[in-house]
Each structure stands twice: as C-alpha cells, then as structure tokens.
Amino acid sequence: LYNAAYMKLFVFDTETTGFVEREGPLEVQPYIVQFSGILLELQEDKTLKEIDRIDAFVKPPISIPFGASQVHGIYDKDVIDKKPIQDQMDTFLAYLNGADIVVGHNIEYDESVMNYELQRLGRKGDYNPQKTLCTMKSCVDFCALP
C-alpha cells in the first residue's frame, strides 16, 4: 500500500477547547475550534503532489478557555462568525474518509476529538479512515525518545 502510485494522504491537525478527559462524560470533552489539513497524492516518481488543503475555523457551543487560547492562539473573537461543527462535519469527513492514509502528530488525540464531535451530532461511527499513521509514535525510535 505504501508504494502505490496515486495513493492519497491527508495530513491533518485540530485545535480544540482543551484536553480529553479519559473518564469524563461527553459534555466535558473538548470541541474543535480549527480543522486544518493538506491532501497529498503520491506520484509515480515517489514525490508528493498537493491536491487540496483546508483550514477551517469552527464556532464551538462553549467559550474557548483562556488556557487553550494561550496554546493555539484562537480566541472567541476569532470564531464568533464561523460555522458550527454540524455545518462543516461532512466536509471534514470527506477529507478523512476519502484518503488512503490519514496522517497526524499524536493522531489518537485528533481522532478522539473527531469522534466526540460525531457522538454529539448523533453520527457515531461516521469517521472511517482506511489507514492512519501517527508521526509522533513513528518518530519515537528515530529520535531515541523514552
């Protein structure tokens, strides 16, 4: 699969209202405030060609906590006139589910947040990537991290 010409990779990241609470109820889980990614296509010569990109801000149903804003630089004023998640989820899923491989750094976090948002929308199970790759996990040995 990794050598297939014209394979599509979607490299993405989310910014959110906070951290995942592993044991917490759905209401306390973070909301997406930004969804960004680049759709790439592997060429026959093993280079990657950019096909499309997305950088979408999302208006969450709660105020963005100050601590989260200090991390990613997105404040309530930046998303006040943006579309809510329910108006953008189909677009996000088209990128995620349409790629052969979805790539992210600490992708488990981004996947968790996507799934929480889908649960809130009554769409549990709509995120179905063919394959995922976590750059954080794949670099642990390379960087000699504990």
Regions inferred by a protein language model and the residue ranges of each:
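Short acidic, Gly/Ser-rich segments with clustered Asp/Glu that frequently serve as metal-coordination loops
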Residues: 14-23
